[in-house]
């Protein structure tokens, strides 16, 4: 049993709390929804509960598959116990199908099947709008090393294969998603969350969107999309 202490950090969708175990934190999932680098904001009732449950199920699955993550256990509807990592200030964006900003940037039709999975890298800095960078930028600015980045890409590729297969069984196409990583006792761990906030999930038969695009694009029924992902994951 761990006890929650002071809040260490508050982000757009989560709060991080210290605990009486030095190497553990409590991650609390909020109902806040944001898009376009915080320009669009709303409260969506139960979003935090659903994202906590979805992320917990996915991290449990990845842990069983040998992927090392920061996730320890789900504590309650909104809280997880996680290892206290030093976050690598990068996001790895995995694109299996062209959608969103990539489709717009490259003049591709949404839904275009990419000839190979594309990894993109962004520098985590809200004031800069999380700009896309390349491997040399990432190493050059001191965010990582080539050795660490190779390890991150290796884990990312494995996670993509595991998740694509798992969601395919539930008639969900994993279009794209973002991952974050942290350093913990000399190792690189998968961190943050994997949820409809961080992934694009399309129904394999209808193409219906079941993710944060419903909020970004004012499509309505945001929470129903999240709930549908959870219901299928539980099967």
Curated annotation (Swiss-Prot):
One of its GO terms (biological process) is 'de novo' IMP biosynthetic process. It catalyses: 5-amino-1-(5-phospho-D-ribosyl)imidazole-4-carboxylate + L-aspartate + ATP = (2S)-2-[5-amino-1-(5-phospho-beta-D-ribosyl)imidazole-4-carboxamido]succinate + ADP + phosphate + 2 H(+). Pathway: Purine metabolism; IMP biosynthesis via de novo pathway; 5-amino-1-(5-phospho-D-ribosyl)imidazole-4-carboxamide from 5-amino-1-(5-phospho-D-ribosyl)imidazole-4-carboxylate: step 1/2. PROSITE patterns: SAICAR_SYNTHETASE_1, SAICAR_SYNTHETASE_2. It comes from the Bacteria. GO terms for molecular function: ATP binding; phosphoribosylaminoimidazolesuccinocarboxamide synthase activity. Keywords: ATP-binding, Ligase, Nucleotide-binding, Purine biosynthesis. SUPFAM superfamilies: SAICAR synthase-like. Pfam families: SAICAR_synt. Its EC number is 6.3.2.6. InterPro entries: SAICAR_synt/ADE2_N, SAICAR_synt_PurC, SAICAR_synth, SAICAR_synthetase, SAICAR_synthetase_CS. Belongs to the SAICAR synthetase family. This is Phosphoribosylaminoimidazole-succinocarboxamide synthase. It comes from Clostridium perfringens (strain SM101 / Type A). The gene is purC.
């Amino acid at each position: 049993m761990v006890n929650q202490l002071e809040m260490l950090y508050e982000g757009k969708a989560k709060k991080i709390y210290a605990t009486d175990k030095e190497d553990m934190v409590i991650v609390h999932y909020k109902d806040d929804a944001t898009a376009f680098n915080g320009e669009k904001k709303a409260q969506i009732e139960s979003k935090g509960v659903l994202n906590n449950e979805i992320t917990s199920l996915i991290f449990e699955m990845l842990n069983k598959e040998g992927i090392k993550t920061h996730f320890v256990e789900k504590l309650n509807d909104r809280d997880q116990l996680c290892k206290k990592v030093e976050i690598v200030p990068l996001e790895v964006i995995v694109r299996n199908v062209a959608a969103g900003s990539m489709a717009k940037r490259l003049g591709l039709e949404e839904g275009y099947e990419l000839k190979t999975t594309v990894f993109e890298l962004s520098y985590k800095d809200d004031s800069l709008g999380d700009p896309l960078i390349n491997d040399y930028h990432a190493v050059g600015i001191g965010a990582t090393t080539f050795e660490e980045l190779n390890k991150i890409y290796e884990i990312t590729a494995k996670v993509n294969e595991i998740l694509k297969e798992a969601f395919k069984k539930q008639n969900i196409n994993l279009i794209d998603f973002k991952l974050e990583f942290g350093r913990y006792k000399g190792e690189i761990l998968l961190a943050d969350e994997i949820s409809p906030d961080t992934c694009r999930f399309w129904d394999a038969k209808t193409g219906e969107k079941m993710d944060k695009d419903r909020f970004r694009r004012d499509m309505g029924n945001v929470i129903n999309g999240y709930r549908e992902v959870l219901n299928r994951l539980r099967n």
